[in-house]
Amino acid sequence: MDTAVDTHPPETKPRYGLELLAVLSVSFGLDGITALLSFIRAQVTINHGLGFSKVATGPIKEATKSAYQWLDILDQVVSILGGVAAAFLAIVLLMRSPGGPGLGVGLDRLRSREVLQGLGFAALIGIPGIAFVYVARRLGLNAQIVVTNFPDVWYRVPTLLLEAVQQGIAEEVVVAAYLLTRLRQLGWTNSRALATESVVRGSYHLYQGYGGFIGNAIMGLVFGWWFQRTRRVVPLIVAHAVIDAASFVGYVYLHGRVSWI
């Protein structure tokens, strides 16, 4: 039997392990987990499915309901991990080039000051953003968006909060930290890179209408400007997560009670 000879230095193995995990997380690794959960759900349906549960009572019916709920929770967790996977891959790629402490994007350690800065950014962007959404809706610049259609279950709010954190990590690590870092390394000027980052951020919000593009492009300019001057991404993650958390949870409790939401 042939034996593979490992000629790579030992210090590269952890990096290769992270790289392998990152690639699988954005491709077939999480797909496999999702397929496994679907398979388990199918087996539960076959054994204790809709036809059976109509006549099932007591412990059997409750156990079936509980199984479906836990499968749904696992589905949500896998979905959130899938959203963070792109950020994980971006971090692994940043590790391949010298960037100083925290990969040159401020991921070395969490500072309490940065959390406060993030909360300040959330207020700076979020409060005018509410007025902007209202005006845009009145002018017909924004589409009517269903922020979340998550069913009314006990784990709805915790899941929405985790989704908000996932969005903050994914967007700010990829669009702010990774994109602006690589554009700088390609020799782009700050203004050109900032404009590109702003357009990219606005573009994937076009489903919200013109207002969604404009609002997020402005957010991109502010966040990108901050990152270019500080090289710290954590305040942006905090701000983005807080804004999205307020949007998601606010929609749950205000939709149908406030006419323009």
Region roles according to the model:
Residues R15-V23, D72-I80, E114-G118, R156-L160, ...:
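Residue-level signature of transmembrane alpha-helical entry/exit and packing/kink sites
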Residues G104-I127:
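Interfacial segments of alpha-helical transmembrane regions
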Residues L36, I40-V44, I73-L74, R111, ...:
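Generic hydrophobic, helix-prone segments enriched in Leu/Val/Ile
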Residues M1-G104, V249-I261:
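N-terminal, membrane-interfacial amphipathic/helix-forming hydrophobic leader that caps
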Residues G100-L103, L110, E114, Y178, ...:
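Generic structural microfeature
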Residues G29-G32, G126-I130, Y134-I261:
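Transmembrane helix-loop-helix hairpins at the membrane interface
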Residues P101-V105, Q144-V147:
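Short, hydrophobic secondary-structure boundary micro-motifs
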Residues H8-R15, T64, Y68-D72, G106-L110, ...:
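Membrane-helix interfacial "entry" motifs
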